[in-house]
From Swiss-Prot:
Protein name (database record): Netrin-3
SUPFAM superfamilies: EGF/Laminin, TIMP-like
Organism: Gallus gallus
GO cellular component terms attached to this protein's record: basement membrane; extracellular region
Pfam family, one: EGF_laminin
Amino acid sequence: LRLLLTTSVLRLARAANPFVAQQTPPDPCYDESGAPRRCIPEFVNAAFGKEVQASSTCGKPPTRHCDASDPRRAHPPAYLTDLNTAANMTCWRSETLHHLPHNVTLTLSLGKKFEVVYVSLQFCSPRPESTAIFKSMDYGKTWVPYQYYSSQCRKIYGKPSKATVTKQNEQEALCTDGLTDLYPLTGGLIAFSTLDGRPSAQDFDSSPVLQDWVTATDIRVVFSRPHLFRELGGREAGEEDGGAGATPYYYSVGELQVGGRCKCNGHASRCVKDKEQKLVCDCKHNTEGPECDRCKPFHYDRPWQRASAREANECLACNCNLHARRCRFNMELYKLSGRKSGGVCLNCRHNTAGRHCHYCKEGFYRDLSKSITDRKACKACDCHPVGAAGKTCNQTTGQCPCKDGVTGLTCNRCAKGFQQSRSPVAPCIKIPAINPTSLVTSTEAPADCDSYCKPAKGNYKINMKKYCKKDYVVQVNILEMETVANWAKFTINILSVYKCRDERVKRGDNFLWIHLKDLSCKCPKIQISKKYLVMGISENSTDRPGLMADKNSLVIQWRDAWTRRLRKLQRREKKGKCVKP
């Protein structure tokens, strides 16, 4: 009653929610947590429904007992692998053998590698006196013996009838005198177990020899010699040489079975047909191939291995930090890592390099604000073509190798105590020694400053007339200062250019030269790390590259409110509103 109630509840649940009945069953190749584990296809009769090639079949020409053209009296090879029952046993039958010896061969192609557990034959005639079973692992190209049956093992097959099986010979075919009796005259059985009596069968996972031994793509059965009816009063003389009075014989088999599993090396739970209708494993664990016998591309961090009960031995992806699509396996690196990792990335992208694409290639450095897996993890060094001694920078800091006297991350300016030269070999040269008497070092203003100039007022107004009188109008940031002879040399960064008659004046680092007397009289007044509006006249000087400013120049601390006004004046100048003074 309880079982009936449970069944009824399940039916109601499926009717209410069809999804309950359609849920995908769990994948046997992974446990409940998603971790890989060994999986194997179901055990099947691999011979069922397969075509069997027989070297001899009765019915052509027709005889009293066999006619290939009459389905009721035909005994084709298809009967060997069809559905047989005890009540309806269909039998294949060979031609009548009038002359002996006469071998009859049955060849079965499994269509794929199988791990064979047994081969069995159920006879409709008396069992043969001598039978040999062979297997092929290369789809019938070559054959190796699997098992012999004979009452005369040494005479027929050159094998002893009772050989001892050891680990040294467990992959060799044996010969037995069992299962060769004449009786029963029908329904007799020959059953060969591939692992029976093999010493390593208990540890099959660790025995490559036995794994190879049970593998087959084709099975061949050779009936070498039938029973001669001496015991039933048959002739002895002339029987084996096919004398005129020899008794006729034939072989007849009702069922050929090959029990085993699709060979998938523990990496698939089933076999399916591919686009060409060939049987292949439905591989998991990042494996591929008809038998899951190799790793998928990019999963070469460790060598392919067969799965075992203890280890799934799944193929692992190479660690390339998302910068490569291909890799290869290196056994030496794998051994050095303690058999943990042997993958080597190929063709690293995004300016990366290394076995794992884990550092930047030459000419680039790491942007530590981004993950190593980011496409922009490596930035170009951008070393100055003149100031840098090479194109390669420090891969951690990005610092380029600077020439003597050059400084900056990209080697784009002269260091303190050096001045720019015209030589690309030595772009910065040391400033020559200065005569102390010619340098104004006092911070006090000279006595004649009042008559010399007047400092600029803070509320200075900019108009079109003053704008037009100047050769350049720029916004600058004062970086540092050094003295050269009677001049103060300021390293500046030009932030904006509002007017310029000299094409060399561009945004970026430059120099501003002011005579020391002008600076001492605070005409103009300048402080380091401040922003200024500079309006002045261009003066070409080979000794002093950059901008020049004097007591007549306008150098006042920058105000953001001027931006709009200066852009307006700039537009008016382009329209021709400036009249040349």
